[in-house]
């Protein structure tokens, strides 16, 4: 109906005039939570983190999870869900500000890829290996993680930020 709040894959905008085909994919947003809460919980980054970690990663209490791009929208949600599930969380991000913020969010260990050797730090922090890797980056960070991955570990490939510039072939 006119004035309904709907969600769908239509891009970020305040208004949308749907085609007949669009109407099939739009969903009315239920009026059960405040709009900011709904956007946070059910936005694409939240859905990606939730189902990627819980359905593919299947985290168990005590497992070690490494999250690259940990200060990004999806990565930060993954870190927090993993903590709720009782995991030891190692977050990888770039810069003091992002790394400090991750510590405030409860991430157990943080690696600043801009100012440290990721492979060396991972070896120190993941003494019993890595059970889950939520990969938002790819490239050299993925390679560092693979050397420490445990048997029966789960790797969730979510993004490949390291290849976004197009300067190198993946």
Walk through the language-model features, giving the residues of each.
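Short glycine-centered segments of the SAM/dcSAM-binding site in methyltransferase folds
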Residues: 5, 64, 88, 153-155, ...
